[in-house]
Amino acid sequence: MPMIDLPHAVPGSPQALPDFDLILFGATGDLAMRKLLPGLYRRHVSGDMAAGARIIGVARTVLTREEFAAQAEQSCRRRVGEAFDASRWREFAARLSYLRVDAMAHADYEALATTLAPRASVVRVFFL
């Protein structure tokens, strides 16, 4: 896979950052809920994410996108505390999607590939 030359990012200037898809495996787990999603929310609030950035939660748990977003919101509210902003959360939540993927089910990986296919040119980050 070719390396991508990223522009120097200046904090708070999302125009310097490329659009990306973050595929977060284990999205319903403790690490994602306690650390990763609250940290990503903070990056969103500080303006450190490109407008087209997406966060695709992937896990074995059967959830709708709305249920996943509600769990993430509850966790972010706890972790961020008084700095939590409901209007900024709604913006951040619009970036979230969720796919149930069973590691042993080929069809589930095909569904993930289908989700990613329309944005083949963006940076993809797989967090396992």
Model-derived regions, located:
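N-terminal low-complexity, Ser/Thr- and acidic-residue-enriched intrinsically disordered segments
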Residues: 1-67, 113-114, 124
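Glycine-rich phosphate-binding loop and adjoining beta1-alpha1-beta2 segment
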Residues: 45-97
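A structured beta-alpha segment of the ubiquitous adenosine-cofactor-binding alpha/beta core
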Residues: 79-123
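Periplasmic-binding protein-like
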Residues: 126-128
